[in-house]
Amino acid sequence: MNEAETRAELIDPKLKSCGWGIVEGSKILREYNITAGKIQTGGIRAKKLTADYVLVYKGIKLAVIEAKSDDLEVGEGVAQAKQYAEKLQLETTYSSNGKEIYSICMKTGAEGLVDDYLTPEELWNKTYPAAGSGNNTVAELADAWRVKFADVPYEDKSGTWQLRYYQEIAVRNTIEAIANKQQRILLTLATGTGKTAIAFQIAWKLFQTRWNLSAGQAGLKPYVARRPRILFLADRNILADQAYNAFSAFPEDALVRINPKEIRKDGRVPTNGSIFFTIFQTFMTTSKKIVEEFKEARLAEAAEASYTSYNFGQYPPDYFDLIIIEHSSAYAHTIR
């Protein structure tokens, strides 16, 4: 049989018998495009990377399968299976010729022939080992939020746009860190790789699930189901404006552009909204001419007064549930 026949007659039935596409929440993505192909000299693209199967459960990609004709040895697909799993940062990957299944764990390095594919629940528990413990542990609470976040689809502009594979990985890893209550997260990406798009999708999932600091701490317990307050900080107005415009899929009343003129006009910083955009310089502005005096005085009371005199000091501690910093190395001293 050729590869297409091998898939239809041997691999597909095997996946079905293991619950894939049958168990609620499980899905099989076929001919999944990982990359469009590297752009080469003259604008010609290299061959795109396409995975034969990607196994999805509870909205999260868990494994990839490289299929080969039953006329070939199962080992023929191992290198590709590893390459695709590495690209997608998946722990589990398979190569199959329909007659045999070769399993690879990218995390431990364990690999070899197996009788069956892992079921959706088995693969989930392998990827997130503490999730199936049945205890109300931090891991169990993280798993609850992991599922909530995964239930929210990426905003794709009515199907006209989709995340690149590395952008999806960045969003997934960030959301995973948030689910695990990690307080600081650093994403390092080159210019032009879509940092704002990544920030948007992270904010989108938090906004739609009504995640906030109290909710994240409560886990499975009752909590105040309010929209998160998110601050987007940039070092230049053009970047803050671009981000504000890029977040247009959010409700209009959720977006707030903080600027000095409105602060001077209203006499206070804005608080009515969910996602706030501004620059460091605006937040570090003070309307009082006492900062230098406070610095010289070095008194606790003076330090407190100095803090509240800045625009950022008008917000209560932990007012923002998430702060996204558009980091630029030229302004590293400002960020510190």
Where on the chain are the PLM-derived regions?
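Short, hydrophobic beta-strand segments that form beta-sheet elements in well-ordered domains
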Residues: T93, V256-N259, I325
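Walker B catalytic acidic pair
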Residues: I279, E326-H327
